[in-house]
């Protein structure tokens, strides 16, 4: 009887995050817990490196302690100070030979080869720039969670693209549309800025979003939960690490290998999960 109970306990533990779920996340590896407050992961297929935005302090503070680090696809830390002197860097995106980073009130432009900061684009009246995405035309969008807006960097000029949101965070440009995670909801803006709510009822701390199939997404919430969301509004809870005190912030994704990279924020690590 004891063996049977142990087996059942193990079975329940293994499946606790995938009950009634068609899609699952299985841990592959975790880095050492020495990354100073990792908020965002950018997967670079070109050089097969994970770029990690590290706050190393308070999320909205301009303290110069922030950095962009490098981690290998095996989970081994390469360089935690590839770019230093930032404040509280968060969402990232690559355009040509440049990496763009949301950093409190600036969009920072970095040379992708050298790691040299090339330029900073101040976003007027911004308070808490959070996520960043780039569309196929080279337009750069950044969310400001505290002022409830999304801004646009185009041709070197910054303008307000959309407002009247609750607390926008995660952004993803898909074709002519812009997907926005807004306090537990997933909203789609079409090319005419007409909003459509795709899904709602997720944890209020919605943070990162990646597309895994046309119309299907993995959505992370800072509090420690990850969902699989479809364009029909259905969603599955794939992961819940709240009890362990492990955050699931702005995720990265390797579409070829179907690996989701999760920055754990206060746990100071990045965890790789196989999506099935």
Task: Annotate each language-model stretch with its function.
Residues 53, 102, 143, 181, ...:
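Residue-level marker for isolated small/hydroxyl-bearing positions within beta-strands
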Residues 71-75, 111-116, 153-157, 190-194, ...:
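Short loop/turn segments that connect beta-strands within beta-propeller blades
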Residues 56-60, 106, 147-148, 185-187, ...:
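Short glycine/acidic-enriched loop and turn motifs that connect beta-strands
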Residues 1-26:
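Bacterial Sec-dependent N-terminal signal peptides
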Residues 250-276:
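Blade-level signature of beta-propeller repeat domains, shared across WD40, Kelch, NHL, RCC1
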Residues 35-47, 64-65, 83-98, 124-140, ...:
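Beta-rich, blade/repeat-based domains predominating
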Residues 25, 106-107, 112-137, 142-143:
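Asp-box/WD-like beta-propeller blade repeats and closely related beta-sheet repeat scaffolds
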Residues 26-32, 76-83, 116-122, 157-163, ...:
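A short beta-strand motif characteristic of beta-propeller blades
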């Amino acid at each position: 009887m004891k063996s049977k109970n142990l087996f059942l306990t193990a079975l329940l533990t293994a499946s606790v995050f995938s009950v009634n779920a068609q899609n699952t996340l299985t841990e592959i590896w975790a880095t050492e817990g020495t990354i100073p407050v990792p908020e965002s992961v950018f997967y670079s297929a070109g050089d097969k490196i994970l770029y990690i935005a590290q706050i190393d302090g308070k999320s909205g503070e301009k303290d110069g302690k922030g950095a962009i680090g490098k981690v290998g696809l095996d989970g081994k830390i390469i360089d935690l100070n590839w770019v230093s002197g930032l404040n509280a860097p968060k969402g990232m995106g690559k355009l040509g030979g440049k990496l763009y980073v949301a950093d409190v009130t600036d969009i920072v432009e970095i040379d992708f080869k050298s790691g040299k900061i090339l330029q900073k684009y101040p976003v007027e009246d911004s308070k808490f720039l959070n996520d960043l995405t780039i569309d196929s035309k080279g337009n750069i969008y950044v969310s400001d969670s505290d002022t409830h807006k999304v801004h646009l960097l185009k041709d070197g000029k910054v303008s307000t693209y959309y407002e009247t949101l609750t607390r926008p965070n995660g952004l993803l440009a898909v074709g002519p549309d812009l997907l926005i995670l807004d306090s537990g909801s997933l909203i789609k803006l079409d090319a005419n800025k007409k909003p459509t709510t795709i899904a709602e009822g997720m944890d209020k701390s919605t943070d990162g979003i990646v597309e895994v199939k046309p119309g299907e997404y993995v959505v992370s919430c800072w509090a420690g939960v990850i969902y699989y969301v479809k364009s029909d509004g259905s969603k599955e809870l794939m992961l819940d690490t709240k009890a362990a005190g492990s955050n699931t912030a702005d995720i990265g994704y390797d579409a070829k290998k179907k690996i989701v990279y999760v920055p754990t924020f206060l746990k100071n690590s990045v965890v790789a999960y196989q999506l099935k």
